[in-house]
Amino acid sequence: MHPTGPHLGPDVLFRESNMKVTLTFNEQRRAAYRQQGLWGDASLADYWQQTARAMPDKIAVVDNHGASYTYSALDHAASCLANWMLAKGIESGDRIAFQLPGWCEFTVIYLACLKIGAVSVPLLPSWREAELVWVLNKCQAKMFFAPTLFKQTRPVDLILPLQNQLPQLQQIVGVDKLAPATSSLSLSQIIADNTSLTTAITTHGDELAAVLFTSGTEGLPKGVMLTHNNILASERAYCARLNLTWQDVFMMPAPLGHATGFLHGVTAPFLIGARSVLLDIFTPDACLALLEQQRCTCMLGATPFVYDLLNVLEKQPADLSALRFFLCGGTTIPKKVARECQQRGIKLLSVYGSTESSPHAVVNLDDPLSRFMHTDGYAAAGVEIKVVDDARKTLPPGCEGEEASRGPNVFMGYFDEPELTARALDEEGWYYSGDLCRMDEAGYIKITGRKKDIIVRGGENISSREVEDILLQHPKIHDACVVAMSDERLGERSCAYVVLKAPHHSLSLEEVVAFFSRKRVAKYKYPEHIVVIEKLPRTTSGKIQKFLLRKDIMRRLTQDVCEEIE
């Protein structure tokens, strides 16, 4: 019997009762996964405890601010925080949100959640009030952790005035790494004032471990639900494919609120007893310094990270002899970048996945260079991949269609979004990614484009619809459409085509940026180019012909007639 994913379709049971989430599994597939050892009873907390006991004095995590925890010290800090959470009434299944950059404290909070069966909800540091209020209410978070200071702002203070809009939120904690907490509880004081957890909390592998919010075509972020078994299956397959062991040192420059950072930068290392190296603000100089200092053996990130590192290495050589490989995902690897890495002796590997199915296609370390440059890998252990047409019928090798996957890593659905879940997951457990790809005879896939309407800017997903909805609130704008435009470093940037209301005849990019700033949305969602036109091209049924606008922006870029934000 070939393993398949959990049964998730229109008849999936997803309900909230007293803030608890109930998941229903297809018992036949669940049994198959358990029989093959892909799923089990153990939770992430069980794996953590096993590692912490086996190597208490080994360094578990460090960050660029000089913080460093052994497995024993990290376990103690997390246990003290978990004890406080229990005292404040947190129960198994409650959602705990934390909006932290790449700091050791992220891991402390995550592990504290695991110890008491709470559900981790990591959030992007770039989010502002609009996204935060939406997500915290959506997942009904009971606690929220944020820095007292980061990037010259006080993130924890953003949420304090909004508590009247967050009825479920009971505690706000300031992570006082860079500045003292003045208006909230402080994480350091909580850990200092509490003793280690003495009560053993049992969590089953089928219970919810995390909700990761991801942007998509529907506008506002969707909560991707992952069980302990989903995450364990994903990361064990990931580590096995890349021969990762306790001797490896993981460099993670990506945000920990992303699946990339959360799963591969924090979770995977502790499953195998490796070291995690975190960077809160990516600059190529800071990244290279950590790579050298920590003797990092592997690094994972989007193409812009590689692009920037190569530019610095041209002028400033660095000792990267310990680096076994750089794993690149999120967007296509330009041939120029791949060739430069090869010339410098950096093994650049491709990986493909999504928050919903992460990561399920990876190359082999001993694959020929052509595989690295021209494919995005093949299915990880226990995962199936197929390419389908618009009717979701399987296509033969070589044909372009939508990529679909199923396996023990595939998510359990979107949090409190049964209709979106039913569209993404069919009754046989297949997740339809919305990405276009081709598969060769050997099972290797190559992502060729997207069906879904998103812009991938340096690995960050931007919903065109969300940006359009904000643009349409501008007093000068009558109609708007947002499309992706190519960018050598980031892969894509967003370009807004707007039709103005009479009697307005002009609209500057500065005006649009100021408007988005007042709307308190994340900066990476701001339009970076703007084109004012008389009307948007539409079909006879009224649908905007975005392909014409994409062609137009390509033409405009070559002629350099588009206003660009610096």
Swiss-Prot record:
Reaction catalyzed:
hexanoate + ATP + CoA = hexanoyl-CoA + AMP + diphosphate; octanoate + ATP + CoA = octanoyl-CoA + AMP + diphosphate; dodecanoate + ATP + CoA = dodecanoyl-CoA + AMP + diphosphate
Known EC number:
6.2.1.-
Q: Where in the cell is it found?
A: Cell membrane
Q: Name the UniProt key words of this record, in alphabetical order.
A: ATP-binding, Cell membrane, Fatty acid metabolism, Ligase, Lipid metabolism, Magnesium, Membrane, Nucleotide-binding
Query: What topology does it adopt in the membrane?
Result: Peripheral membrane protein
Main location per the UniProt record: membrane
Q: Name one GO biological process term.
A: fatty acid beta-oxidation
Functional pH dependence: Optimum pH is 7.7-8.2.
| Transmembrane segments annotated in the record for this chain | none
Q: What does this gene product do?
A: Catalyzes the esterification, concomitant with transport, of exogenous fatty acids into metabolically active CoA thioesters for subsequent degradation or incorporation into phospholipids. Is maximally active on C6:0, C8:0 and C12:0 fatty acids, while has a low activity on C14-C18 chain length fatty acids. Is involved in the anaerobic beta-oxidative degradation of fatty acids, which allows anaerobic growth of E.coli on fatty acids as a sole carbon and energy source in the presence of nitrate or fumarate as a terminal electron acceptor. Can functionally replace FadD under anaerobic conditions.
| Additional remarks | Probably starts on Met-1; overexpressed protein starting at Met-19 has lower activity, forms aggregates during reaction and is unstable in storage at -80 degrees Celsius. The enzymatic mechanism is a two-step reaction that proceeds via the intermediate formation of an acyl-adenylate (acyl-AMP) intermediate.
What's the protein here called? Medium-chain fatty-acid--CoA ligase
Q: From what organism does this protein derive?
A: Escherichia coli (strain K12)
